[in-house]
Amino acid sequence: MAQRPAFSICQGKVVSKTYSFEWFSGFALSQKQKSIESLHNAIIGADADAKPLEISTRSKETMGIKLSAFRLKLNGCFLENIFQSAKVFERGGPYPGLLDLPPREAKGDERLHNSGRLTAFRYENEDFPLTPKTVFYDYIYIKAVKNTLAADEINAISNYNYFTDIEFNPAKSINTQARTAAIIKLIFDDYG
């Protein structure tokens, strides 16, 4: 059994609830999709009104793939690359050269792991603090959604009420596209 969070809206807030589900090991897309289906079945088992959306390149839903940080673009660059390239560390960064790499290569660049403690994000000549912890990621993600998707596609986010990212492990990471998609839904729910 594995555990992953799902993000939803409750009483005007984005909330996270962890679900246990059967994990299908392996790197094949089919294995990831079996794990996603298992996670979504656990969510639906707990809430019969659940309409979960996996937000990643592993999603079976076109909308989930389009909302992936590996597909969204901002100023012609993939969102994942912008996020990784904007990191400022004690001994290096930002690393604008990461904008030109494939997203998975940018995410795995050694400098991101060997430059000391993360101190800020720098994007478009503006520094973003580390607190609140997700402010920079949420900002560029929402901007990229607006920049990449058509209005009807953005509105379609409201058709879902749970958001997941099978690759997101809260023990290893802070930012997730699933939570930021839930923020977008919250904005629609509260402000139209």
Q: What is the role of each PLM region?
A:
Residues 3, 59, 95:
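Phosphate/adenylate-binding glycine loop and adjacent helical scaffold
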Residues 1-55:
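Short, extreme N-terminal leader segments that mark the start of a protein/domain
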Residues 170-184:
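Active-site nucleophilic cysteine motif
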Residues 142-165, 177-179:
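A short mid-domain helix/strand-loop element embedded in enzyme catalytic domains
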Residues 186-191:
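Charged low-complexity "KEKE/polyampholyte" interaction tracts
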